[in-house]
Amino acid sequence: MIYTLDSYNPEKEGRLPVFIWAYPREYTSKKVASQVRNSPYRFTRINYGSPIFWALRGYAVMASTEMPIVGFDGDQPNDSFRDQLVMNAKSAIDKIVDMGVGDRDRVGVGGHSYGAFMTANLLAHSDLF
């Protein structure tokens, strides 16, 4: 889900800084990882720690961004955690930039619990942020 202000107009305002909020999930197969788990008909829940707050500050917020970590050929998903994580983050950034919404040079990332572990790994092992 991507959140921006209702008044945001890409033609007038240009590209926005981006905040990616994610939580990686581990899967043992590509088939299971590809299942749809979200719906555009869900209610948006905002609480004191919600990343959606940043949309009110002019960011494009990618909330609940999918970061699947898949085990291949009997390997455990975490055997290739970093590589898949960086690939997922790059894909998310490429998508929002291709949509004309996000600015590739102003991207931040965050998450809670395992999402914080993901954040630390992305900051340490990529040059995306």
PLM ranges: what are they?
Residues 1-129:
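Serine-hydrolase catalytic core recognition
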